[in-house]
Regions:
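Short, glycine/polar-rich helix-capping loops at beta-to-alpha or helix-loop-helix junctions
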Residues: 49-54, 124-134
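Contiguous mid-protein beta-loop-alpha structural module that forms a pocket-lining wall or clamp
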Residues: 130-143, 147
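P-loop/Walker A NTP-binding module and the surrounding RecA-like catalytic core of P-loop NTPases
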Residues: 39, 107-111, 116-119, 129
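N-terminal regulatory modules in eukaryotic regulatory proteins
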Residues: 148-232
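Acidic beta-strand-to-loop metal/phosphate-binding motif
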Residues: 12, 42, 95-102, 109, ...
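Domain-level signal for Mg2+-assisted phosphodiester chemistry and nucleotide/NA-binding surfaces
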Residues: 1-84, 89-90, 119
Length: 232
């Protein structure tokens, strides 16, 4: 990785799969993670289906790549994005990729990029398949970026995160029953790339933990420590 304060990211949008109305929120999120130095959006701009994207490209500082589909089956924009990603990878300039899509076709690409040691962040909708979510270092749900309410059936409550915390503690496997909050968060993220405290209604892990009935916390120096509440 290059010696810089913020990771240099290549951001690749699948315009056929992600609505343009989400672009602002996505770019804000990416900017909070690193420097989105390369921003490309892929689609068939002759089809008329991407009018909303066409109207935002210059405003958002995106570079549009034309991929005209002349065959049935595999989406031409998917192929174009994959080819570009490999060219960018071999250029050796970037620390990581952000793939903006909910399409499982990019699972193999994400895996290939990670094999070369690059960080891969996926951003997509809740419909994104588990295979794509799990192959990324981190997967961010668009619904969490725009504050779109989840259907009651799929809405997660704070206490639903307790099993993830217990699993993280098992992974860490230490003798002391007090765990550093940052250590817990990293263990959860490693096991569940799509973990996001916003899914449970809280912006930070500390706020989520405070809302849990089954844990207790204490300060130790500058660290917040936590453990499972003991029975009785």
């Amino acid at each position: 990785m290059a010696d810089r304060d913020r990771p240099l990211l290549a951001v690749l949008f699948d315009a056929d799969n992600v609505p343009a109305k989400y672009a602002d929120a996505i770019l804000r999120e990416v900017t909070s993670i690193g420097e989105p130095a390369l921003r490309r959006v892929y689609g068939d701009w002759t089809s008329g289906r991407l009018k909303a994207w066409s109207e935002r490209i210059l405003e958002l500082g995106l570079v549009a790549h034309q991929d005209t589909s002349n065959t049935t089956g595999k989406n031409a924009s998917d192929i174009g994005l994959v080819i570009d990603a490999m060219d960018i990878l071999h250029g050796g300039r970037f620390d990581g990729f952000v793939i903006v899509s909910s399409d499982s076709d990019f699972t193999a690409l994400a895996n290939r990029l990670r094999e070369d040691g690059l960080t891969v962040i996926g951003i997509g909708e809740a419909k994104a398949p588990e295979a794509l979510r799990n192959v990324c270092n981190r997967f961010i749900l668009i619904e969490n970026l725009i504050g779109e309410p989840q259907p009651a059936k799929g809405r997660a409550k704070a206490d639903d995160a307790l099993s993830l915390i217990e699993g993280a503690m098992d992974k860490i496997d230490q003798d002391d029953d007090w765990y550093a909050l940052g250590q817990i968060g990293q263990a959860i993220q490693n096991a569940h790339p799509d973990f996001d405290t916003r899914t449970y209604g809280h912006r930070k892990l500390s706020a989520l933990v405070d809302a849990l009935k089954g844990v207790e916390t204490r300060k130790q120096g500058n660290q917040l420590m936590m453990r499972l509440k003991r029975a009785g």
